[in-house]
Amino acid sequence: WLRQPVAAYLRRFHNRSAATFVPTAALAAQLSAQGYRSVEVISRGGDTALYSPARRDEALRRAWGLPPGGLAVISVGRLAPEKNLGLAMRAFAAIRRLRPDARMVLVGDGPQRAALARAHPDAVFVGMRHGEDLAAHYASADLFLFPSLTETFGNVTLEAMASGVCPVAYDYAAAAEEIRDLG
């Protein structure tokens, strides 16, 4: 019963502002359709000095248990139901059928970690990473899985691309606006 009053309050609050800034054109269209005025898109950028293919680390890949030439598939984020990690793990299973040398690396922590670790004992769980350590994890991967449908942007997509890692994601939010199919 609170949904409509809260939505009305937020709309009034934002409409009193000179502008409401959002990260994607899709979100701008959604808010405009709900009666928000002066909605402006400001795309986010990424730190390409930090997130770079130059941070690839063969020792880290070996620590993940990858054989030479193996395929490192990475997911970065909170290990929680809203991140749709079940789909990521099913996608990885399909990848592994084609590439038995593939290894799934999950960067992050959260309420699903224990259940995921039990269900996928071959996956590598590295916990939370930050700064240069996180950047090395991205750059040392070959493929980035981002199955979430709950993000308004998802900086991880830009971080993976800046690191030279191919992203696989839904045609949604930042992925829809930042990833191009050139094939």
Predicted regions: what they are:
Residues 52-66:
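A short helix/loop element that forms part of the nucleotide-sugar donor recognition site in Leloir-type
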Residues 166-169:
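Short hydrophobic beta-strand element within catalytic cores of glycosyltransferases
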Residues 26, 45:
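Carbohydrate-associated surface elements
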Residues 67-83, 89-93:
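Conserved donor-binding/catalytic core segment of Leloir-type glycosyltransferases
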Residues 114-132:
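Nucleotide-activated donor-binding/catalytic signature segment of Leloir-type glycosyltransferases, i.e.
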Residues 149:
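Aromatic "clamp/platform" in nucleotide-sugar-dependent glycosyltransferases that forms part
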Residues 3-19:
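Membrane-proximal helix-turn-helix segments that form the acceptor-binding/catalytic region
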Residues 14, 128-129, 136-141:
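Short alpha-helical donor nucleotide-sugar binding micro-motif in glycosyltransferases
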